[in-house]
Amino acid sequence: MIEMKGKRVLVTGSGTGLGQGIALEFARQGAAVAVHHSHSATGADATVKQIVDAGGKAAAFKADFCEVAPIQTLAREAVAFLGGLDVLVNNAGITMNRPFEKTTVEQFDTLYAVNVRAPYFMSQAVVPDLEKSKGVIINIASIHAFRAFIEHTVYAGTRGAIVTFTRNLAIDLAPRGIRVVGLAPGAVPVPSHFKSSPGIDIEKAIREFGKSIPSGFAGTPRDIGEIAVFLASPAARYIVGQTLVADGGTTTLMHFGEDFKQPMTAQFGQGYVPGV
């Protein structure tokens, strides 16, 4: 267990999913947490209630990350509530899988506004507070920054931008005592991912999905939360500018798919199985 007692943490996009798991884990380890949401007030309130009921300190804040002004307001309000800031987790983001030629300018701009511009200006807004505490910025990216996936061109571009942003911001802020790191989760299925499939056995679906991952199981929001807590701790003080991949081994595989496997089999024989 890593002690976070007395630490003050802001986790963006923490009303549901990974962000919620990160916020709850920081709270379990003793941190006071500012929970942010853009439209999931119910989830954010539930996160806060769970923390407060366990004896912790938390409050929910709403901010639309499509604009910069609400980001700056969130920074001020969260820091005022917490009494300072030790850790910023830039987790808020949106995804989109859409054919390249059907992506609109509005969709493109929205993804980059929320996934790239928002973390940039959120970090900028809290630098004075993090400089006082010699704090940490954790940018949540994705394995889409490192591996291609069909119809994810825009989304993957935003995740790659976060990895590069993390590396460069780390160099800018290290002399001021602020450590910047990244965390790139693989697929972490949560119940909300299955809302378009009523009647499905969610636990079974998650178990089946886990069989496709080298680890043999799918990660959970708490898994990602525990890694985030580690990255924010003194134990990770020598990790600067790097983005840690946490995906159960997904990106270690070399997979060509059946269409590529056929000519490779013809060339090397039936015993050749790409990626094994």
Regions found by a protein language model. Give the residues of each.
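Substrate-binding pocket helix/loop in short-chain dehydrogenase/reductase
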Residues: 99-100, 104-112, 209
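Conserved glycine-rich cofactor-binding loop
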Residues: 8, 15-17
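Active-site helix of classical SDR
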Residues: 123, 158, 166
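C-terminal helical subdomain
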Residues: 105, 182, 202-239, 246-248, ...
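Active-site loop immediately N-terminal to the catalytic Tyr-X3-Lys motif
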Residues: 101, 147-153, 175, 216, ...
